[in-house]
Regions:
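Boundary-proximal intrinsically disordered activation/regulatory segments immediately upstream
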Residues: 1-69, 156-157
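Short acidic-hydrophobic, aromatic-tinged amphipathic segments that line or gate anion-handling sites
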Residues: 4-11, 80-85, 176-180
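Short active-site oxyanion
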Residues: 33-36, 54-58, 78-80, 148-150, ...
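Phosphate- and divalent-cation-binding pockets in alpha/beta enzyme and binding domains
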Residues: 47, 68, 91, 134, ...
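Short, conserved catalytic or adaptor-binding loops enriched in Gly and charged residues
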Residues: 71-76, 167-171
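A glycine-rich helix N-cap at a beta->alpha junction
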Residues: 73-94, 178
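Glycine-rich phosphate-binding loops that contact phosphosugars or nucleotide phosphates
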Residues: 103
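RNA substrate-binding interface of SAM-dependent RNA methyltransferases
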Residues: 109-180
């Protein structure tokens, strides 16, 4: 892999999306177009990639370059992979990485309610669920219950927030959803 970049300076601008940009700022990163989100853990990243989301960069704990992350990284030889030891990454991000890997990805335009509801028979409707952990758990349950789609009111937390996507184990990328 020739796209590995050792992190020696955690203040470089390329790492801002991982360390110094809030979830809300990521959401609005390219306004008025869809912004960014951070996927955490190889399983969640793999599901996002399989759903067609575009990676911008990866942040990987050095010891995990040869672990679960390796197969994902080999598929994207031109995408930058920033890496450092555990202590450096925790100091930069403020938390331990789940399974040692993060990925900055571009959001996509959300489908309309009409597009979501077309050819569906089982839809979960979420009203004002503000906790990202709860959003993730509900999406995971919706997947287990074979829901065709999820509709969220504008008062709901974003399913692509890092914690919501991680708790859902990536099912937010497998079940169609939108706000109404």
């Amino acid at each position: 892999m020739n796209n590995i970049i050792e992190i020696n300076d955690i203040t470089v601008p390329e790492l801002d999306v991982y360390a110094r940009t809030s979830e809300v700022q990521l959401l609005r990163y390219y306004e008025p177009k869809p912004g960014l989100f951070i996927a955490e853990s190889p399983k969640v990243i793999e599901r996002a990639l399989n759903a067609g989301y575009e990676p911008l960069s990866f942040l990987v704990e050095h010891k995990d370059l040869e672990g679960e992350a390796k197969q994902i990284l080999e598929r994207y030889p031109k995408i930058p992979v920033y890496t450092a030891e555990y202590d450096v990454l925790v100091g930069m991000t403020g938390y331990a990485l789940a399974r040692g890997m993060l990925c900055a990805m571009k959001r996509r335009r959300l489908p309309s309610v009409e597009e979501i509801c077309q050819n569906t028979s089982r839809i979960a409707i979420l009203e004002n669920v503000v906790n990202p952990t709860n959003i993730g758990a509900i999406f995971r349950s919706a997947a287990a219950l074979h829901m065709d789609a999820v509709l969220l009111t504008s008062g709901c937390s974003d399913p692509l927030y890092r914690r919501a996507a991680r708790v859902s184990m990536g099912t937010v990328f497998q079940i169609p959803w939108t706000y109404f």
